[in-house]
Amino acid sequence: MKIAVIGATGKAGSNIVKEALDRGHEVTAIVRDSAKVTESRATVVQKDVFDLKTDDLKGFDVVVNAFAAPLGQEHLHVDAGNVLIEGLRNISGTRLIVVGGAGSLFTDESQTLLVKDAPGFPDFVYPTANNQGKNLEILRGTSDLNWTFISPSAEFALGKRTGSYQVGKDTLLVNSKGASYVSYEDYAVAVVHEIEKPQHLNQRFTVVSES
């Protein structure tokens, strides 16, 4: 498949690029600075996400939004999401995969409290979580786009690629140790698996792995 990854040099994006290439897909890394791309197997396009138009996104089976907004500019998660919605809604057959956050998940099955609103949630993370949540709500209100929003666990860290993970929908998951954890490597496995075998069209899902 032909896959474009926006934000391909970040932790999530770079692992998704590698996983997709390792599985034999054609990957285009769309980045602001081509010098930061270390994966020689990927095609590189140097372009800011806010400059992307429909013509830039044509020809891809899937566009992965792994954009990471700088601290203090977290509203750009919403802005970048809107750019991609507008760019893709006129392209038939191209799917949008969004690298989301855990803050918009519910804390438990009662589904009365979001992670980002729970006591003890870090203040400096809240703007990112809040704006990623807004992006999700906008997607849920979009009827002419094929999308999937993938939330990691509360702890999202570089680790090992085990290839094993558990899937949930809108509630924060924990592993056998009681930890809400997923490595970037296993998250990338889940993303590419969803690309290859779609199970969550126009939905959000979340993943957890062993720590």
Model-derived segments and their meaning:
Residues 137-157:
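Conserved beta-loop-beta element that borders a ligand/cofactor-binding pocket
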Residues 34-91, 199:
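NAD(P)H-binding glycine-rich loop region in Rossmannoid oxidoreductase-like domains
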Residues 142-144, 157-164, 194-203:
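Glycine/proline-rich active-site loop of Rossmann-fold NAD(P)-dependent oxidoreductases
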Residues 29-36, 153-154:
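Short, polar loop motifs at secondary-structure junctions
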Residues 34, 83-127, 137, 141:
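Conserved Rossmann-fold NAD(P)-dependent oxidoreductase catalytic core, especially the SDR/UDP-sugar
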Residues 3-23:
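N-terminal Rossmann NAD(P)H-binding glycine-rich loop of SDR-like oxidoreductase domains
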Residues 2, 6-9, 93-96, 170, ...:
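Mid/C-terminal beta-alpha module of Rossmann-like enzyme folds, strongest
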Residues 4, 28, 148:
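Conserved beta-strand positions in the Rossmann-like core of class I SAM-dependent methyltransferases
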